[in-house]
């Protein structure tokens, strides 16, 4: 008398018996079991509309990135509830329009091409589609979600001095003053261990009159005087 919804009630158990015109039972009761046949009336639904993952730059093809998951209220043991995944688009499309692939049954996303470089592309956006009926493009119902993949930094760029020679000066007998500011550039992500420069004086100061430390904000090398310098004895240090 009313429409049936398998997702609400998948099976009905009825008990029936026959009676005569006077209402007396003429047969023993019998059990009737009615199974509601599933119809493909539910689209796949992703657990999240936006999925976030990460992968180190320079990762080899076949590196696992993340897993996306969708569910379907239809019968999971029938075609109506059997899902398949695929990537609809990738942005940006460099260095290849197919940097990633997805396992169509599990939703696992892995790298499929080399060339991930954080200094060139820091983030990829994939549109993922889930389709029931085992991915049938004609009869299956579909839904989409977004996968955002961040390319994380690795230490693949050395610091480079901005000049071959730096100059400084200091009055004699002064200590704890900055005499030179050495500047470097590093293409790795700022304020990470891959970016932080460590300086040392490798020659030209046998008596240890100078020290150098890193400015944590600018990454510059700050040369300071730690022992008094006599102008009449030493007029220049290289």
UniProtKB/Swiss-Prot annotation:
UniProt-annotated binding residues for Ca(2+) 1: 5, 7, 41
Gene Ontology BP, a term: cell-cell junction assembly
Record: glycosylation sites: 52, 104, 181
GO cellular component: adherens junction; apical part of cell; catenin complex; cell junction; cell surface; cytoplasm; desmosome; intercalated disc
Annotated Ca(2+) 3 binding sites: 40, 42, 72, 80, 132
Post-translational modification: Cleaved by MMP24. Ectodomain cleavage leads to the generation of a soluble 90 kDa N-terminal soluble fragment and a 45 kDa membrane-bound C-terminal fragment 1 (CTF1), which is further cleaved by gamma-secretase into a 35 kDa. Cleavage in neural stem cells by MMP24 affects CDH2-mediated anchorage of neural stem cells to ependymocytes in the adult subependymal zone, leading to modulate neural stem cell quiescence.
Segments forming domain Cadherin: 1-46, 47-161, 162-238
Residues annotated as binding Ca(2+) 2: 7, 38-39, 41, 74
Extracellular-side segments: 1-238
Main location: membrane
GO molecular function, one term: calcium ion binding
Topology versus the membrane: Single-pass type I membrane protein
UniProt-listed CDD domains: Cadherin_repeat
Keywords from the UniProt entry: Calcium, Cell adhesion, Cell junction, Cell membrane, Glycoprotein, Membrane, Metal-binding, Phosphoprotein, Repeat, Transmembrane
Localization of this protein: Cell membrane; Cell membrane, Sarcolemma; Cell junction; Cell surface
Pfam families: Cadherin (PF00028)
Subunit structure: Homodimer (via extracellular region). Can also form heterodimers with other cadherins (via extracellular region). Dimerization occurs in trans, i.e. with a cadherin chain from another cell. Interacts with CDCP1. Interacts with PCDH8; this complex may also include TAOK2. The interaction with PCDH8 may lead to internalization through TAOK2/p38 MAPK pathway. Identified in a complex containing FGFR4, NCAM1, CDH2, PLCG1, FRS2, SRC, SHC1, GAP43 and CTTN. May interact with OBSCN (via protein kinase domain 2).
Biological role: Calcium-dependent cell adhesion protein; preferentially mediates homotypic cell-cell adhesion by dimerization with a CDH2 chain from another cell. Cadherins may thus contribute to the sorting of heterogeneous cell types. Acts as a regulator of neural stem cells quiescence by mediating anchorage of neural stem cells to ependymocytes in the adult subependymal zone: upon cleavage by MMP24, CDH2-mediated anchorage is affected, leading to modulate neural stem cell quiescence.
Listed PANTHER family: CADHERIN-2, CADHERIN-23
Domain comment, as recorded: Three calcium ions are usually bound at the interface of each cadherin domain and rigidify the connections, imparting a strong curvature to the full-length ectodomain. Calcium-binding sites are occupied sequentially in the order of site 3, then site 2 and site 1.
Protein name, UniProt field: Cadherin-2
Source organism: Cricetulus griseus (Chinese hamster)
Originating gene: CDH2
